[in-house]
Curated annotation (Swiss-Prot):
Pfam (any one): Mug135_C
Entry function: Has a role in meiosis.
Source organism superkingdom: Eukaryota
Subcellular localization(s) per the UniProt record: Cytoplasm; Nucleus
GO BP: any one term: meiotic cell cycle
Keyword tags: Cytoplasm, Meiosis, Nucleus
Organism: Schizosaccharomyces pombe (strain 972 / ATCC 24843)
GO cellular component: cytosol; nucleus
Protein's name according to its UniProt entry: Meiotically up-regulated gene 2 protein
Gene: mug2
Family to which the UniProt record says this protein belongs: Belongs to the UPF0612 family.
Disulfide linkage: none
Length: 296
């Protein structure tokens, strides 16, 4: 074989090593756009002009140098043979082309976005009427409705926030008394629930004490206060039976018990249940009518 052919084969071999190195660098995520040699670019250009797949394998580069379809040993090469190495090389070149085209598209898209951003920044801070006029007169709004519409909506939102921060305090001044009244009512209801829980707790304690024969404890009224000093303490069922009608009504009103004006003996029974005297001896005790005056 002539010396020139050996030199061509050696050049092809070195070029193949460069391609393998570029493929390894591509797998590692490194830049490989400058690793393709001049001979490979020539092969790609001719293949694209003929609308044929690019063959950057060792054999394809050898055919480009010698213009003969031969392999490394000078034997005739079957062009229909789909070598996996050739397929990988073509895929590698195609990925490079897509990468370069995507970079170009990315730069152009970035420039377009920056241009739209500058245009949005130049928009005047105005009301919705001015914003609608800008939308109608802007030729890019029909092409890019979502971006510009979101930007203008954001402008209106900022203006609304400014209005709320500056105008809302003055407009809310008339509502302050009603808000304070609502807060006061809430606190009062909270206190009432707390007093009701305290009364129920003392009532439960009396039920346990009376079941074991102990006297009852004083149960606070529904408003949280204790019975007045002029009222007798209710320790046993006899204390309830000795109450006058006025005293019994005072206790019943303090505990928030609904009554009927015609009730007589039932008032004492309701008071007995309200303070927790539910033992067997208490329930079986027969109460008398009201005394005309408190016992001395």
């Amino acid at each position: 074989m002539k010396k020139e052919n050996w030199q061509k084969i050696e050049n092809v071999y070195l070029l193949g090593k460069k391609i393998d190195k570029a493929k390894r660098m591509a797998n590692k995520g490194e830049s490989n756009t400058n690793m393709l040699s001049t001979e490979e670019n020539i092969v790609k250009a001719k293949a694209v002009s003929r609308k044929k797949p690019v063959d950057v394998s060792y054999a394809g580069l050898a055919r480009h140098e010698s213009h003969v379809d031969t392999d490394y040993h000078g034997q005739a090469l079957n062009t229909d043979n789909q070598d996996p190495k050739n397929y990988q090389a073509r895929s590698f070149v195609k990925e490079n082309e897509l990468y370069e085209s995507s970079q170009d598209c990315g730069h152009s898209r970035l420039a377009q976005i920056l241009s739209e951003e500058n245009q949005i920044k130049r928009l005047p801070q105005s009301d919705n009427t001015t914003t609608e006029r800008i939308i109608e007169n802007n030729p890019n709004y029909s092409n890019k409705p979502s971006k510009l519409k979101r930007a203008l909506s954001g402008e209106n939102s900022v203006f609304s926030i400014h209005q709320r921060n500056t105008l809302s305090p003055s407009s809310n001044l008339p509502r302050i008394p009603s808000d304070l009244y609502d807060i006061k009512q809430f606190l009062e209801n909270l206190d009432a629930r707390s007093f009701k829980s305290d009364m129920d707790l003392k009532r439960s304690q009396n039920m346990r004490r009376r079941a074991t024969g102990y006297p009852a404890i004083v149960v606070p009224f529904l408003n949280g206060s204790l019975p007045q000093a002029d009222l007798p303490p209710l320790r046993t069922i006899e204390d309830i039976d000795n109450l006058t009608r006025e005293q019994c009504l005072t206790f019943i009103q303090g505990y928030g018990i609904p009554i009927d004006s015609s009730d007589t003996v039932y008032l004492k029974e309701k008071l007995r249940d309200a303070i927790g005297m539910r033992a067997f001896t208490d329930m079986s005790f027969e109460m008398n009518s009201f005394h005309l005056e408190s016992p001395r």
